[in-house]
Amino acid sequence: FGGIEGVMRGKGELLDYLQTHGGTAFYSSESEYLAQMIGKRKGLQAVPYSTAGMTAAEKGNYLTVRKGATEIRTHLVGDYNIGNVAAAIAVGGHFGVPEQQIVAAIESYEPDNNRSQRKAGARNTLIMDAYNANPSSMRAALANFAKEPSEQPKAVVLGDMGELGKYAEAEHAGIVELLQQLGIGEVYLVGKLFSEAGRGIYPAFADAAALNEYLQEHPIHGRLILVKGSRTMKLESVAERL
C-alpha cells in the first residue's frame, strides 16, 4: 500500500464497495480513522463494536476474555487479540447467533496459519505471528511477550514490516528502540530494514535463509520464542529450524 495513506485508501475502497452493493461494514468504533470514514459514507450500513466492558487476561498460555458474566477461553496468544474477539461477537450478534454459540465458536477456534499460533516443539516453544506485521501489531506483540510469565528464557525473531513507504526506516528504528526498552536480550533481526535499524545492536540477517544457515551452526534450545514479521519474509522456514 506504500504507507498509511495507502492503507486508508484501500479500506476506503472496501467501504465504497459495500456501500454500492448494499453490504454491511463491521468496524471498531475505537478507531478514529475508521469512524470518520464510515461517517462520510451516508447510507452505508455499519455496525460498530468496541472492547468497552471487556477485560483480557492470560490464563495458562492463552487469552481469556471476560465480558460481564461471560468468560471466553480462547486459543489465541496475547491480550491485543481482544479486539478480534469483540469483532467476532459483533458479527455473530448481528446475524442473530445465540451468545452461547458465539462463545463456543470462538473457544473452538485454533489458529493454524501462523497468526497468534503457539507451537511446542522438541527444542523450543514458538509463538508464531508471521503472517502479517505492522508497527502497531508488532509493538503490541512485543509488549505482551515481554510481560508473559515463562520458565524458559525468551528470544525474539523479527522480520521486516512491509508497505510502510516513507515511514519504513523510522518505524523499524522505533521497534529496535522498543526492544531495548523491554529488555529482551536475545534478538534476531531479518531483512534489510531491520538490519539497518539494528546495526551493531542485535544480530541481523539479510533474509530467512541466512538466519537458517546461522541456526544450523548455532542451534537454539529451551527458549520461548516470538516469531513475527511480514509474510514476504518467509519466517515460517525459520520456525522449522527452531
Task: State the predicted function of each range.
Residues 49, 202-214:
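Short acidic-hydrophobic, aromatic-tinged amphipathic segments that line or gate anion-handling sites
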Residues 113-117, 232, 236-240:
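ATP-dependent carboxylate/acyl-activation modules
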Residues 34-35, 212, 235-236:
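Short, well-ordered alpha-helical microsegments
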Residues 1-4, 85, 138-139, 168-173, ...:
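Conserved strand-to-helix beginnings and helix N-cap segments that scaffold or border functional pockets
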Residues 24, 125-128, 155-156, 224:
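Hydrophobic "anchor" residues on beta-strands that sit immediately upstream
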Residues 111-114, 130-203, 230:
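Active-site beta-alpha connecting loops in nucleotide-dependent enzymes
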